[in-house]
Amino acid sequence: MRRPMVAGNWKMHGTRASVAELIEGLGKQVLPGSVDIAVMPASLFTNQVIEGLRATSIIVGAQDAAIQAEQGALTGEIASSQLADAGCKLVLVGHSERRQLIGEQDDVLNKKFAAIQASGLTPVLCIGETLEERKAGQTLEVVGRQLDSVIAEFGVSALINAVIAYEPVWAIGTGLTASPQEAQEVHAAIRAHLAKENAEVAQGVRLLYGGSVKAANAVELFSMPDIDGGLIGGASLNADEFGAICRAAGN
C-alpha cells in the first residue's frame, strides 16, 4: 500500500511576514497522520519554515538544488548537502517552470537527481507535457521520454527512493485541470511504463498529480487508483485550503 503524499510548492512567493502567517495557519490545521505532508518554500525562508513547523508533522523540502551534491564554487546555487544540513527532506527536480522558463535539459536534471539522492534526500521528479504536445497526442510519448532519461542514466531502481509528479504544463497556474479520469489515464500509463522495467518499482513508487489541485477537486482526484497524492501550487499558500487537500488525501 503506497502512503499518500501532499507536497506544497510555494514557488517564488512570500515575505518573512507572510510566511510567518502561513506557518501559523498550518499549525492550526488538523492533519491526517496517514499522509506524508511537505512544503517547499523559497530557499530564503527554509530555516524560518523548519523552525516554525517543528511542532507539526509537516516536513520541509526545497524547490531546486545544484548539479553537485557538495558545496563549492558555484555562485548563486545551493548544494543538496547544504539543504540536507538545513533540515530539508526532499527536493523538486525538473519542475516545468525550470524546464520551460529556465531551459533546463535532461542532462542537467539528471545531475541534480543524482546529487539529491547522494545527499540522502528524496527527489520529486516532475514530468509532463505542454498544451501543444497534448493536442498532438504526444502526452505518453513525452512523459515516457522524460522518465527514460533518468532510467537510462541510473536504472529504474533509482526511482525506489524517489517520488514522481505528473504535472501537465497546460494545467499549472491556469486554473485548468485534467479530469480525474484523464489524470488517472496518464498515471496508469506511467506505472505501466515503469512496470516494463521493474514491476516492483512500478507498484511501489508514488505518483503525485500536479495540475491545479484544489480542495474542491482533491477528493475525486485522490480517489483514482494510481494517483497517490498531489503536488500543490497556488492552493498551498492558503493554510485552510492546503489543510483541506491534505485531509482529502487521508480519506
Swiss-Prot record:
**Keywords for this protein:** Cytoplasm, Gluconeogenesis, Glycolysis, Isomerase
The record, for CDD domains, names: TIM
Q: Which PROSITE patterns match?
A: TIM_1, TIM_2
The record's subcellular locations are: Cytoplasm
Q: What EC number(s) is this enzyme filed under?
A: 5.3.1.1
Query: Which terms in the GO cellular component ontology are assigned?
Result: cytosol
Biological process terms in GO annotation = gluconeogenesis; glyceraldehyde-3-phosphate biosynthetic process; glycerol catabolic process; glycolytic process
Its recorded reaction(s) are: D-glyceraldehyde 3-phosphate = dihydroxyacetone phosphate
State the InterPro entries in the record.
Aldolase_TIM, TIM_sf, TrioseP_Isoase_bac/euk, Triosephosphate_isomerase, Triosephosphate_isomerase_AS
| Annotated active site | 95, 167
Annotated residues for binding of substrate: 9-11, 173, 212, 233-234
Q: What Gene Ontology molecular-function terms does this entry list?
A: triose-phosphate isomerase activity
On whether Isomerase is a keyword of this UniProt record, the answer is yes
Query: One Pfam family from the UniProt entry?
Result: TIM
Q: In which pathway does it act?
A: Carbohydrate biosynthesis; gluconeogenesis; Carbohydrate degradation; glycolysis; D-glyceraldehyde 3-phosphate from glycerone phosphate: step 1/1
| Description of how the protein assembles with itself and partners | Homodimer.
PANTHER family from the UniProt entry? TRIOSEPHOSPHATE ISOMERASE
Q: What role is this protein assigned?
A: Involved in the gluconeogenesis. Catalyzes stereospecifically the conversion of dihydroxyacetone phosphate (DHAP) to D-glyceraldehyde-3-phosphate (G3P).
The family database entries (HAMAP family) matched by this protein are listed as: TIM_B (MF_00147_B)
| Family, per entry | Belongs to the triosephosphate isomerase family.
Name this polypeptide is given: Triosephosphate isomerase
Q: Which organism is it from?
A: Pseudomonas savastanoi pv. phaseolicola (strain 1448A / Race 6) (Pseudomonas syringae pv. phaseolicola (strain 1448A / Race 6))
